[in-house]
Amino acid sequence: MRSYGYTDGWAGDGSGRCRCSSDSIRRYRSRISGPLLDRIDLHVEVPRLPPQALRSGNLGEDSASMRARVVAARQRQLARAGAPNAHLDQAQTDDHCRLEGDDQVLLERAIEHLQLSARSMHRILRVARTIADLDGSAAIATRHLTEAIGYRKLDRAIGTASAA
């Protein structure tokens, strides 16, 4: 699902094209329902790249390397649970997405601060497990969990809008 940050489509562009007031942005974002957001695993903002970045030739990981990491991660998931992380039920998520003490506290604080549902919490855990798999890690590390929490960007935007 794609969503523009607000009505004119220039969210976060930095070009000065956006003329929306903060109230109109807040109203626009509040139209997205919480139950719908709960069902989206990754909320990612993809900014427009300047032409210089496109010409530099340094665009990150190449497709072949990325594909190899994805294939290896999927094999780990199938070997561990017999299914991809996205298809784990609650009991499987609890079993295969365990966190250490400090990370459990971090997740609980994020859930409270962002006012997330149990469904969102389980999605965060499955995404963190997937990030760990892509990293070749047997356990979910703090960096995997914080990255997964970071992908709840729309929850933060809506939470901020409803708090104002």
Feature annotation, model-predicted:
Residues 1-164:
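Basic, amphipathic alpha-helical bundle interface domains used for macromolecular binding and assembly
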